[in-house]
Amino acid sequence: MRQYLDLLQHVLDNGADRSDRTGTGTRSVFGYQMRFDLARGFPVTTTKKLHLKSIIHELLWFLAGDTNIKYLTDHGVTIWDEWADENGDLGPVYGRQWRSWPDGHGGSIDQIAGLLKEIRRNPQSRRLIVSAWNPAEVEAMALPPCHCLFQFYVSEGRLSCQLYQRSADIFLGVPFNIASYALLTLMVAQVTGLKPGDFVHTLGDAHLYSNHFEQAREQLQRTPRALPTMWINPEVKDLFAFRFEDFRLENYVADASIQAPIAV
């Protein structure tokens, strides 16, 4: 996945050194875009192995509208543990905003259901958008949304997705985000009868934490391999009916993972 390695190199070479909320320090650029043709393979890093189990379960958890880590914990996924309270709650994070955005009148808006309806009804629409950034609730979230808005686009029977990510931890977070939204695009394409198009990833503050520099340089010494393919159970036609067992990454050959500390 050369696009991702180019991002690592660009930030190392051109980024500005900055302080940050966690006190760790970062090297950062503002504004960067990558594009992945999903017909050419599933965009997952081959220069370090990713934990696909966590990515799939997290996406299913988002789509369920869940904001408590119990489901993740029950399935051995720990990526949200640092931010949960003693009851496992995270506040009104992604799942709530995607599926139950308060409408101001005592009800809620299911953005995902509305998105699917609009893709089927009016695929040329320029309003195929889901936002997780709710200013009225952002202060109550354990972690404000980093990947905060995405838009779908249909052309010639192909479904593309563009994600805007306001804050991008490019060593630990971005590979997960690429795989997660690529998978979401494949799932939405399947249930709406479309073919997968491109995944476009637009980054706002794209940063390497200072304690990830050496790990990034190590990864840049590795040679990317051919991308794997993601098999999705073709029998599933309801986005909310997918289960972990409905996905299988095939022909995934990757170098060993590279450990790096997470900034909380």
Swiss-Prot record:
Molecular function terms, GO-annotated: thymidylate synthase activity
Pfam families: Thymidylat_synt
Pathway: Pyrimidine metabolism; dTTP biosynthesis
Protein keywords: Cytoplasm, Methyltransferase, Nucleotide biosynthesis, Transferase
Enzyme Commission code(s) on record: 2.1.1.45
Parts of the chain that traverse the membrane: none
An example Gene Ontology CC term for this record: cytosol
Record's catalysed reaction(s): dUMP + (6R)-5,10-methylene-5,6,7,8-tetrahydrofolate = 7,8-dihydrofolate + dTMP
Domain of life assignment: Bacteria
Residues annotated as catalytic: C146
Gene Ontology biological-process entries: dTMP biosynthetic process; dTTP biosynthetic process; methylation
Record-listed dUMP binding positions: R21, R126, R127, R166, S167, A168, D169, N177, H207, L208, Y209
InterPro entries: Thymidate_synth/dCMP_Mease (IPR045097), Thymidate_synth/dCMP_Mease_dom (IPR023451), Thymidate_synth/dCMP_Mease_sf (IPR036926), Thymidylate_synthase (IPR000398), Thymidylate_synthase_AS (IPR020940)
Location within or outside the cell: Cytoplasm
Entry binding sites for (6R)-5,10-methylene-5,6,7,8-tetrahydrofolate: H51, D169, A263
UniProt cross-references to NCBIfam families, sorted A to Z: PRK01827.1-3 (NF002497), PRK01827.1-5 (NF002499), thym_sym (TIGR03284)
Cited PANTHER family: THYMIDYLATE SYNTHASE, THYMIDYLATE SYNTHASE 1
Assembly information from the UniProt record: Homodimer.
Family of the protein in this entry: Belongs to the thymidylate synthase family. Bacterial-type ThyA subfamily.
Free-text function comment from the UniProt entry: Catalyzes the reductive methylation of 2'-deoxyuridine-5'-monophosphate (dUMP) to 2'-deoxythymidine-5'-monophosphate (dTMP) while utilizing 5,10-methylenetetrahydrofolate (mTHF) as the methyl donor and reductant in the reaction, yielding dihydrofolate (DHF) as a by-product. This enzymatic reaction provides an intracellular de novo source of dTMP, an essential precursor for DNA biosynthesis.
Protein name: Thymidylate synthase
